[in-house]
Curated annotation (Swiss-Prot):
It holds the Pfam family Gp_dh_N. This is Glyceraldehyde-3-phosphate dehydrogenase 1. The lineage of its organism: Eukaryota, Fungi, Dikarya, Ascomycota, Saccharomycotina. It is found in: Cytoplasm. Homotetramer.
């Protein structure tokens, strides 16, 4: 049994809790969020505009969240170093704040007594792992990153294509649902002026490090991929459009077959495959990291193709966070 604590009770933190409660070998002992009181934590966990009402009993006793009779301690500390992780016997702290994402800041959880930390964001300094791609390279590191939702969608597909046909170079676009950092109406966003525009009424070009990060989890693709994002007014589910120049000539049917084979093998929980006439909402709550849309891709020539893959950027990603927790435990 692995004891975990969740720091940051936002979109990812709450879904990680939902998913972890379903796993028999995980015991969630605590939640910390300086901005959320215990009664509000109960409300936010119970009601979700995107994924629906939680299907169990949720209440609180003033200091614990009570879910189906199970107590989870709730704290409101700004500094993770002050949390009682040692006393609570926390094996792994899941940091989903988006704030403590480097080795030095995530170390605060170790200082507080946690044995290991899983960061739910890309990191410049912590080793990044994408389940289904490079988790076998994990070598006991105390602090790891689960990379980003988009890297989790792109990397498995890039690996399949590179292993089978070779990728000379490629460009990725993610058409990405809105997230909490965006604005409901035009407002100040000093680092990213476009990002400060109304989320619900615009298609907003944005940067993403997701494609470059693939080179960190798959060194053979280092320097071969880069990408950008368009933020669009949907609440959840995003789609990766990967345009690649192949090393080896292939037919589109051969590419489809290669992905389908992987989706039916040991990576069936990570890679999905569909030939149906699907749209984004069809993937709400999908637990795969990536679902290859065989009917949407196109080919110009034997070495030049555009591939399309869907992902629930909240739920699929949060599922992988919990998988990585189990793996590093």
């Amino acid at each position: 049994m692995v004891s975990i604590a969740i720091n940051g009770f936002g979109r990812i933190g709450r879904l990680v809790l939902r998913i972890a409660l379903e796993r028999k070998n995980i015991d969630v002992v605590a939640i910390n969020d300086p901005f959320i009181s215990v009664d509000y934590a109960a409300y936010m966990f119970k009601y979700d505009s995107t994924h629906g009402k939680y299907k169990g009993e949720v209440s609180h006793d003033g200091s614990n969240l009570i879910i189906n009779g199970k107590k989870v301690a709730v704290f409101q500390e700004k500094d993770p170093a002050t949390l009682p992780w040692g006393k609570l016997g926390v094996d792994i702290a899941v940091d989903s704040t988006g704030v403590f994402k480097e080795l030095d800041s995530a170390q605060k959880h170790i200082d507080a007594g946690a044995k290991k930390v899983v960061i739910t964001a890309p990191s410049k300094t912590a080793p990044m792992f994408v389940v289904g791609v490079n988790e076998d390279k994990y070598n006991g590191e105390k602090i790891v990153s689960n990379a980003s939702c988009t890297t989790n969608c792109l990397a498995p597909i890039a690996k399949i294509i590179n292993d089978e046909f070779g990728i000379e170079e490629g460009l990725m676009t993610t058409v990405h649902s809105i997230t909490a950092t965006q604005k409901t109406v035009d407002g100040p966003s000093h680092k990213d002026w476009r990002g400060g525009r109304t989320a619900s009424g615009n298609i907003i070009p944005s940067s993403t490090g997701a494609a470059k990060a693939v080179g960190k989890v798959l060194p053979e693709l280092q320097g071969k991929l880069t990408g950008m994002a368009f933020r669009v007014p949907t609440t959840d589910v995003s789609v990766v459009d990967l345009t690649v120049k192949l090393v080896k000539a292939a037919t589109y049917d051969e590419i489809k077959a290669a992905v389908k084979k992987v989706s039916e093998g040991k990576l069936k929980d990570v890679v999905g495959y569909t030939e149906d006439a699907v749209v984004s909402s069809d993937f709400l709550g999908d637990t795969h990291s990536t679902i290859f849309d065989a009917a949407a891709g196109i080919q110009l020539s034997p070495k030049f193709v555009k591939l399309v893959a869907w992902y629930d950027n909240e739920y699929g990603y949060s599922t992988r966070v919990v998988d990585l927790v189990e793996h590093v435990a």
